[in-house]
Amino acid sequence: MQTQHFDAIVIGAGLGGLLCAAHLLERNKRVAILERLPHCGGRFTAKTFQGAQISTGAVHMLPFGSSGVLAHTLRRLHIPHRICDADVFGSFHVHGTQVRARGLLGVYNVFGPRQFFWFLRLGYQMFFRRLPAAQRALPFDTWLARHIDTARNAELVAFFASIARFALSLELHQVRTDEVIRTTRHMLRFGAPGIVQGGCGALTGQLEQQVRQRGAHLLLHTEVLQILHNAGQATGVRVRNKASGEQSMLDAPLVVSDIGPRATGALLHNRQVTQAEVLTQHCAQLPEALGLKVHLLSDISLIPHKGIMYCLDTRRIAGIVQPTNADPRLAPASKHLLISHQVIQSTDLAEERALALADLHTLFGESFTRHCR
C-alpha cells in the first residue's frame, strides 16, 4: 500500500477545512486536504439550478458581516471577497405581520411595552452581571425560565428560539447559556450577518484556488476510512479513492478533522458514519445541528431588506433570507431568491418539508401561491 508523508492532513474541504489548510500553508507546512465529494465547499458552496444559486448548507451569509472574525480571517489570508452588510438588525414575523427593526431597540414594536421591559431586564442580566460558574453550562431555556415567566412572554421566548434555530440549527434546550450570551455579545459588537457577493460558492472557490496555488495536495473524491493513532497521538489516515477503489496511507503528525465530532470519533475506531445514522440517532452529549432549507424563486420581492426575517409564529421555519436584495446575480433576471431555514425535529423529512411549505403559505398567503416556485 502506497504511503505519502505530510506535515498536516485536513479531513473535509468545506469552509472550515479550507481555512485551516490556508493557515497551515501560510506557515510553510506540507498539507494534504481530503474530500469525499468531487468538489470543495461542503456546506458552504452552491449549485446552479434553473439559473439560481442553490446553497448546499449556508444561506449565502457570513456571520457578523464584514466586521466579524471570519471576515477578518479572510482579509488576513488575502482571500478576495466582498460582503454586503445587513441594513437592519432584522425583521420579525409575529401575529401575521412582518415588523422591521433597524436596530436592537426596534424590537419594541415586536414585543410591546411589557415584554420589552423583560427584554431589557434580560439584557441587563446577560451583559452587565457576571454569569455564575454553575449557570454557564445550563441549557438556555432553563436559564430563561428562571428569569422570566415564559408562559406570559411567548414572543420573547420565540425571539430567542428563532435566532438559535436559524444561527445554530439547535433548540434552546440544546444550547448552553454562556454560548448564547457570547453569541449575542458578538452580534451587538460586530453586527448582523452579511451576504457574500457571488454567494457562498464564490468564496470557497477563491479559497480553493488559494490553497492550490500555495501547494496544497488536494484529493477530491477521496474517502477517509480510518484515522491512525498511537498512544493518543494521531499518525495519519487510511484513505480510498472512490473512483478506482485503491487504498493508500497518508502519514502526518497533525490530523485536523472538519467533518463533525460523531464522524471523527467513528474514524478513530475504524468505521464510518452514514447520513442515515445522523438523521435517526440522537446523541444527548453531542447535539448535532440538523437543518432543512427551502429555496424559492419569486416574481416579487417578499422581504424588503438585506437581513434576516425571523419567524416567531410558525411551526417550523425559523427565518428567511432574500439574498438577491444584495446580489441579484444569485437568481435569474427579474427573479428574487428566498431561502428559509428550520431545525429538523423528526426523522420524517417529507413531513418536515410539508410543514415548511405550510409555514410559507401562512407567512406570504396569496403571494406565495401566485408568485413563488
Segments the model singles out, each with a brief description of its role:
Residues 25-50:
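Glycine-rich FAD pyrophosphate-binding loop
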Residues 88-181:
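Rossmann-like flavin
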Residues 183-246:
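Helical element adjacent to the flavin cofactor pocket in flavoenzyme catalytic cores
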Residues 225-336, 343-347:
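Mid-domain catalytic core of redox enzymes
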Residues 323, 329-373:
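Conserved flavin/dinucleotide-binding core of flavoenzymes
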